[in-house]
């Protein structure tokens, strides 16, 4: 099971393809102060940001994420993996992998990692375009989770079409 969290993109194609094509997926953008959260619809076509979760104890974090997964009846959890622009591990990569490992041990749904390079930049751009006066880091964190989820869903669709 641990090898699923070791590849540069987080997991192999087979694990991604094992995720059903319907059912909600929750994504997390792990940060040092808070976690951005996003969810997709049942058909995995649209995504939306959810309120952030402030970083606290592991027990509290797990409880909050379990509640979100339960409320949305999520089929999978995707964690953003912060890599450097050249694809190498960043300082935060080990922490993201550890969070994913802990969730994998504690949840009964698949937990996958998704390369999150440039997601914060894209999230800031989107927040600014929607409201140039918006400066909230919380908006950016949840929008980054949304970008991570959209990237994951695009990757999943691409793999499906290649294997059809």
Give the label of every model feature segment.
Residues 1-28, 32-164:
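Phosphate- and other anionic-substrate recognition elements at nucleic-acid/protein interfaces
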